[in-house]
Amino acid sequence: MSEYKHTLNLPHTEFPMRARLAEREPQRLQRWEEEDLYGAIRRARAGRERFILHDGPPYANGDIHIGHAVNKILKDIIVKARTLDGYDAPYIPGWDCHGLPIEHKVEEQAGKPGAELTYAQFRERCRAFAAEQVEGQRQDFKRLGVLGDWERPYLTMDYATEAGILRALARIFEGGHVTQGFKPVHWCADCGSALAEAEVEYEERTSPAVDVRFAVVDELALQQRVLLEGEGVQAGTASVVIWTTTPWTLPANRAVAVHPELEYVVVALDHSERLVLAAELLEATLQRAGVECYEVVGRCRGADLEGLSLQHPFLDRQVPVVLGEHVTTDGGTGCVHTAPGHGQEDFEVGQCYGLEVTNPVDGAGCFFEDTEHFAGLNVFDANPRVVEVLESRGALFHHEKYRHSYPHCWRHKTPVIFRATPQWFIDLDRHGMRECALAGIEGVRWMPDWGQARIDAMVRGRPDWCISRQRHWGVPIAVFIHRRSGEPHPQTPQHMEAVAARMEHEGLEAWWDLDPAELLGDEAAEYEKVTDILDVWFDSGVTHATVLEQREGLQVPADLYLEGSDQHRGWFQSSLLSSAAIRQAAPYRGVLTHGFTVDEQGHKMSKSRGNVVAPQDVMDRLGADILRLWVASADYSGEIAVSDNILQRTADAYRRMRNTARFLLGNLHGFEPGRDALVAEQLLPLDRWAVARTRALQERIVAAYDRYELHRIYHLLHNFCVVDMGGFYLDVLKDRLYTTPADSRARRSGQTAMYHIAEALVRWLAPILSFTADEIWGHLPGERREPVFTAEWYDGLFPLDDEPAEAAFWDRVMEVRTAVSRELERLRNEKVIGANLDAEVDLYVSSALAEELAPLGDELRFVLITSAARIHAATEAPVDAASATLEDGSEVRIAVAASAHDKCPRCWHRSPDIGASDEHPELCGRCVENVAGSGEYRATA
């Protein structure tokens, strides 16, 4: 063999078999930065139609986790694919830099503001801490292979952005959407501040559930409202019974609500007392209290009870029965304890009836010292005391423990309370803002489509947006309040603009250092500064105004917002509401959501479970491209499973794709497209089929990229590399590439097809396997001055002349080959043959199938990779021939035998004409022709 090795065209490439991604990717990243790759892409797409994916800013605190990696990789894949589409698709990363978590970190490190630090020093420490966090996260995001304007990201703490946030507030203020109010808001005692809707998460909790008697004050008034039954008037006290899981809110009770349309009953218990409750909940209520004997003595509609006076169970005041559409029969008694200071629905009902908004609880979650019975107690610690007081007053009908979903602070994981405080709100129902937001939802493409119904329901049902926080690190609500009336200064929008202009140069201190007289003149003594800051969800929610409107090369609305599915209640919603207030339209054309990462068993990631997968560890061990391929392989519309096993399987799939690329590159050694490529008409039919197959696949891949169906692309790519290429085309092609003369039509035809395939494949891979695609690009033949990321989808592919018929022919050939391969594998396992080329195959088929396969002639053996392949009539099949059924039901009988001929040392085929050449007695006839003649002729394969 050694004397003929030099006559073979063996593959050669500098593209390494071992990727060593963890080692090589950082080197490639450094080159990208040195060459300003992102800038090169921008220059290449200048003037093209834009595609804007707006980055939802991650919070600048801590290392990135696997969820961050999923989000950034998805964005990067989409931006790179849109660039291949020909769009100018800039990517400006951002960070959310204000807020409580950073305050807590700085307090731990340096002390509290107003004590160890001045407020200005504290804010400066917060700014420095956030900058450190941004830098750490930036390096990790870049390491993922995410291309963007990393040197000019947007930070909500940039002076210009802080000024922009205040200007956005001024625009909303000017539109009449900002109000003040003493309203109940979610309050975290540990934070010492109100919480946004998105900062509340629901967890299971056990609470004390109590049924409480509110005694009817006027017996005659009750009788006048009720249709009496049975014995009519009964002896004993009459009470309306409420049920609540927050006994601590009873000191703030101001009414009992009933539904106007529900049926209510008066039920007598052993002639000792009468209870009023919803008919539908009667049995359940009495059953949990262990009451078996009772009699219904009256009925009425809820509306009939309106205005009935009741005695508070332990305070010296009377409260009315009021009507509320929010009352349901899902549980409880159908009579709802109403404390306007401790619940949104209670507050709204209270507004209708002019009820006092009572809040006896301070910011630490403890009752004020003047609160009767419960002074100084924490609200949750007060629950047992409330039960004691109720029992001592004879007002407790029943008491039990109740397991239910309860709101918790997302930071502290502690239960929150509803607490009425003076706050600033964006009023959703003034000037049609809620309707505007709902209309905006209709015009957006939601992916998955269930996102539309989800956010629609949230916007319809949500309360006004509380935008104020009683903290220090954030954009100030730059408003002057009149000391007597409490009203904002009539020139507030103009004042905000003046402060914003200063903020551009001085940052937040522009407000805190401001002497009111500088803006108010002689009026300064009549006004005081607001000391609240803005909710961080406002900061990120107005980036359509502070970033998209202001940054050159961007535009509003953005084409796409892409975040986790929790952002329907977070960033998607805050962006929508603020945009509805400012622009009367949605800030995005499309919204794409992804699920959360879980382990292989579907469990959430947690340190306690030991199932956390850190992206940094994966990149250091396997490389970023493996992480990127894993993200692409997952159906991100649901939960995304990750584990070491899953990542190892991903690495195996990566190797198959890399090996396909390496085979193509190795066999394109010495191929110059401008010199050696054949035109479509000159290619062998098998090669034309391969190019056409690639073209058809490219259409599917590009369409999947456009629909953001990345997991489909992964499966298409994997199947193409493993089945179409590795399992068929390239396997068949090897013999022709290696054995025919270097410049023969047979070889150049195959190389031309491989060149077209490689040009397409590298582009398909580029959005996902960015490091590997860039590496492949550098080894492809032909001159390449621009990086792969500036390329567009390959347009050099071509269809078959008679696409349906020719495609069907090769599909049938592959079916036959698969059937033969199974039989060859069986015989290899049984040691009948050593390799496929040791075998000769006889196929016994119908005349129709024989006619279909006829174009291959003697070249059928090259397709089957056997030393001989013959076709016979089905009737001639020997009894022991194996049988296979094709997709259309036709049968193929297969007889395989070990070849009796010698093996050619050059091509390894066994052939009867070995020794026919005196000059090359070891070689088969075709190898003699390829070595000493003009080269063998191939007609089809």
From Swiss-Prot:
The entry marks the following residues as binding L-isoleucyl-5'-AMP, namely: E563
**Similarity section:** Belongs to the class-I aminoacyl-tRNA synthetase family. IleS type 1 subfamily.
Residues noted as binding ATP in the record, renumbered to the chain: K607
> How the cofactor binds, per note?
Binds 1 zinc ion per subunit.
- Organism (species): Halorhodospira halophila (strain DSM 244 / SL1) (Ectothiorhodospira halophila (strain DSM 244 / SL1))
Write out the domain note: IleRS has two distinct active sites: one for aminoacylation and one for editing. The misactivated valine is translocated from the active site to the editing site, which sterically excludes the correctly activated isoleucine. The single editing site contains two valyl binding pockets, one specific for each substrate (Val-AMP or Val-tRNA(Ile)).
* UniProt KW Nuclease keyword: no
Q: Which InterPro entries match?
A: aa-tRNA-synth_I_CS, aa-tRNA-synth_Ia, Anticodon_Ile_BEm, Ile-tRNA-ligase, Ile-tRNA-ligase_type1, Ile-tRNA_ligase, M/V/L/I-tRNA-synth_anticd-bd, Rossmann-like_a/b/a_fold
- For this entry, the protein name equals Isoleucine--tRNA ligase
Instruction: Supply the enzyme class, top level.
Output: ligase
Q: Which PROSITE patterns match?
A: AA_TRNA_LIGASE_I (PS00178)
| Pfam entry (one) | Anticodon_1
The GO cellular component terms are: cytosol
Query: Which of this chain's residues are annotated to bind Zn(2+)?
Result: C904, C907, C924, C927
- Which reaction is the catalytic activity of this chain? tRNA(Ile) + L-isoleucine + ATP = L-isoleucyl-tRNA(Ile) + AMP + diphosphate
Motif stretch ('HIGH' region): 58-68
Its quaternary organisation is: Monomer.
Where in or outside the cell?
Cytoplasm
UniProt lineage? Bacteria, Pseudomonadati, Pseudomonadota, Gammaproteobacteria, Chromatiales
- Cofactor(s), by name: Zn(2+)
